[in-house]
């Protein structure tokens, strides 16, 4: 049995929608460090249950070694438990990318639990499931791209339509200092948490819980090549036609400093479709 390292402080049964309205207030630009500490302490922690199939998928020798090495930053068991993944779920992952980090866990998990995993790269062309049938739509590190392309609202509407009533929109996203203009932060890969929350709420979702599972206080978001300066991408020199990049490459010492930060500071959010 897996030893559960995080204390259980809430029941796994998801709170009623009315309770979701008592979430802590959003941060402001003049928020002090003490206020930030209090606000984050009030966020809902994950509740861990023994899920043998999920543990087996995460611990599988079939997962690439490079993926496993990132578990220390991405906390797959805790994060998926926080989002409410259960055996037999129909999970739609949006734009999993070539590496498919979550895919390597979710696909075998679905197969082992008689669930369904669907990868969707172009949500506006189809969500790969019947309307109102998905238990979870998972979005990892994509809101900055959608904002730049002006597709956030249309994508969220597609997710809402695909989810069954009570279904979950699961979000992991590089997090900027809150209150900043997303037009400015998006090219760096980071997005304000309040922007993501308000966009999802405008699409009809209810914010049910936030977690600091994937927070990284070492990440000050001030990097010469955006979030891609950090692992796992580790961009170390200016990219062609990228106006936000520093014009000079990293020195060896700088490269080591950014590697020591680890992966980005990220918001981890759970939204629910009412019903």
What are these regions (language model features)?
Residues 54-82, 86-87:
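Class I SAM-dependent methyltransferase Rossmann-like catalytic core
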Residues 86-98:
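Conserved class I S-adenosyl-L-methionine
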Residues 127-137:
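A short acidic, Gly/Pro-enriched loop at the edge of an enzyme's catalytic core
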Residues 135-153:
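A short SAM/SAH-binding and catalytic strip from SAM-dependent methyltransferases
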Residues 152-165:
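A short glycine-rich, Lys/Arg-flanked "PGG" loop and its adjoining helix->strand segment in the class I
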Residues 166-174:
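Conserved beta-strand signature within the Rossmann-like core of class I S-adenosyl-L-methionine
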Residues 182-210:
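Conserved Class I S-adenosyl-L-methionine
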Residues 251-275:
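C-terminal lobe and adjacent flexible extensions of AdoMet/dcAdoMet transferase-like proteins
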């Amino acid at each position: 049995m897996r030893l559960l390292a995080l204390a259980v402080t809430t029941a796994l049964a998801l709170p009623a929608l009315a309770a979701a309205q008592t979430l802590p207030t959003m941060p402001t630009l003049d928020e002090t460090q003490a206020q930030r500490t209090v606000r984050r302490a009030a966020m809902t922690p994950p509740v861990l249950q023994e899920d043998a199939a999920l543990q087996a998928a995460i611990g599988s020798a079939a997962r690439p070694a490079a993926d496993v090495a990132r578990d220390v930053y991405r906390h797959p068991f805790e994060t998926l438990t926080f989002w409410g993944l259960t055996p037999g779920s129909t999970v739609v992952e949006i734009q999993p990318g070539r590496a498919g980090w979550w895919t390597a866990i979710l696909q075998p998990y679905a197969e082992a639990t008689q669930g369904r995993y669907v990868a969707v790269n172009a949500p506006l062309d189809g969500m790969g499931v019947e309307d109102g049938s998905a238990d979870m739509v998972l979005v990892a590190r994509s809101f900055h791209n959608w904002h730049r392309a002006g597709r956030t609202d249309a994508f969220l509407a597609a997710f809402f339509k695909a989810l069954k009533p009570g279904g979950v929109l699961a979000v992991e996203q590089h997090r900027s200092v809150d209150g900043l203009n997303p037009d400015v932060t998006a090219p760096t890969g980071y997005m304000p948490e309040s922007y993501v929350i308000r966009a999802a709420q405008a699409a009809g979702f209810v914010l049910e819980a936030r977690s600091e599972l994937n927070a990284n206080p070492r990440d000050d978001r001030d990097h010469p090549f955006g979030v891609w300066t950090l692992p796992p991408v580790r961009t170390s020199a200016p990219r062609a036609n990228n106006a936000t990049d520093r014009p000079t490459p990293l020195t060896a010492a700088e490269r080591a400093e950014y590697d020591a930060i680890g992966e980005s500071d990220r918001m981890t959010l759970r939204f629910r479709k009412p019903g």
